[in-house]
Amino acid sequence: MNFKYIVAVSFLIASAYARSEENEIQSLSQRDVLEEESLREIRGIGTKILGGVKTALKGALKELASTYVNGKRTAEEHEVMKRLETVMRDLDSLDYPEEASERETRGFNQEEIANLFTKKEKRILGPVLGLVSNALGGLLKNIG
C-alpha cells in the first residue's frame, strides 16, 4: 500500500516538474518574440527617421550641387563638388543594401546586419554633416 502512494506522489512531482519546465520554456520563447517585435518596431521607427533625414540631406545636397554647377568653380569648390557627389552615391547605396542581403545569405543574424547598417550610416552621416556645414559656411562667406 505504501508503495502505491510513493509511486503516485513521485509521478505527481515528476509531472509538476515537467509542466513547470514546459511553462518556463514557453515564457522564454514568448519573451524572445516580444523582444524581437520591439526591436523591429524600434528599427522601423529609426528607418523612418533616417529616411526623412536622408531625404532632407539629398534635397540640401542637390541644392548645393546646383549652386556649384551654375557658377564658375575654383579647384577647392570642384573638390567639394566631387565629395558631394560621392556622398550622394553613398546615400543612395543606403536605399539599396545589397551588402546586407549577401551577408544575410552567408548566415549572419539580424542583429549583426542591423549593426552593420548602423556603422555604415554613422560612417556616411558624419562626413555628410561636415560637408554640408562646410559648403554652407563657404556659401555664406562668399555671399557676405
Curated annotation (Swiss-Prot):
Pfam families: Bombinin. It comes from the Eukaryota. Residues 19-43, 74-123 form a propeptide. The modification Asparagine amide is found at residue 70. GO terms for biological process: defense response to bacterium; defense response to fungus; killing of cells of another organism. Belongs to the bombinin family. This is Maximins 2/H8 type 2. It comes from Bombina maxima.
